[in-house]
Amino acid sequence: MKNELSKQIISTVRQFVNQDVAPVVNELEDKDIYPKELADKMAELGLFGINIPEEYGGLGLSFKTLSDIFIELSKGWMSLAGILGTHTILSYLILNHGTEQQRKKYLPGLANGLYRGGLGLTESHSGSDVQNIKTVAKKNDEGYEINGSKMFITNGSNGNLFVIVSKTNLNATPKYKGISCFIVEKVDEGFSVGQKLNKLGYRGVDTCELLLQDCEIPLNRLLGTEEGKGFTQVMDGL
């Protein structure tokens, strides 16, 4: 049954690329236009919920199916695969490392495209050196206050939900044990989108700076139940 569904979806994606993507891809890439209509169609096709279990509103299909979908999308336009790929990392992190409350709250919306987003990991000064990020989350009586910035974030301006990687223990040894992940919504006070980056290629999909200035989030937005698990969570998601 799942195999048949996978075949049908891959065939549908191939048709979508030929009929909807091919006629507009050159203009969208050249003018760096976010493909909202195409992304909305991807949501209608169920692509944002490919690996999310059915109990949370997804299709519950395999990563093999997802990789085949990436191939078909990339044949038409790599940027569409980028939109889906980053979104899928976000979904994976919440599914595999979030609490049941977090899964029930966010996964149905991630599956149907109500929530779209990505991973706030990279910073301008540290690149992929995760242990040396400078974004800090300080715990208080009501939750966490996050300060810092993220760079090169896919889906940065058009996303509305992100996992933000932050330091929670500046004195941890080794450093990676002082890193935690947090679920941040675009509407959270203190969260904003900075500059959109101009790229030579891989255009259309937005790549942006994210700014967190005294960003207040509740305690239950810590991904999972324990601080200090962020590094291993992110490595698993990637």
Protein language model features and the residues they cover:
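A structural signal for short hydrophobic beta-strand segments in well-ordered beta-sheet cores
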Residues: 135-138
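Long, well-ordered alpha-helical segments
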Residues: 13-18, 98-105, 141, 145-147, ...
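Glycine-rich beta->alpha junctions and the first turn(s) of the following alpha-helix
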Residues: 2-4, 8-9, 75, 192-238
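A short, Trp-centered hydrophobic/proline-enriched beta-strand micro-motif
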Residues: 113-121, 165
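A short core secondary-structure module
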Residues: 147-193
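Amphipathic, small/basic residue-rich leader segments at the start of a protein or domain
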Residues: 1-84, 101-112
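N-terminal glycine-rich flavin-associated loop
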Residues: 78, 82-101, 127-130, 140
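Short Gly/Pro-enriched turn/cap motifs at secondary-structure boundaries
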Residues: 125-128, 152-155, 172-173, 199-206
